[in-house]
């Protein structure tokens, strides 16, 4: 039986789409649910392209009710994947999916992580600090932003003439290539 993946996303969903595409006809896993805190997030449209059920929630329903957590449990989700999801995940979610909830971050953690460090803010800080390399970190989710145990990292050079946008392009390429592969590896290790 295929293992089910739930994706939590807040934005356009390019990583989510790469994951949905990768697992569309996969023997090990499938994306069973895409959840978003934004009703106008483009990730919801991308999910429709793959016939993946979606669910939208607000802050109240995410933090003060069991609705979202119960939906994931009732769907039989094995792995929860954060892909551009910008809210801190409640402790009861983390307890329900111990070492089965992961996130991707556009920097080499522990550097450039934490609250407010996402997207262009990360790349601006990396360039401002004249770093020689950046990359991606895939990590387990815990109660602190970008603090969970690192599962996988990939590096890329920060070029002297890089802008936040040019660096972001190379980071996105790493994300799109490696996130589905790491998810596949984790699914293979789950009972």
Model-flagged regions — what are they?
Residues 1-191:
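One-carbon transfer enzymes
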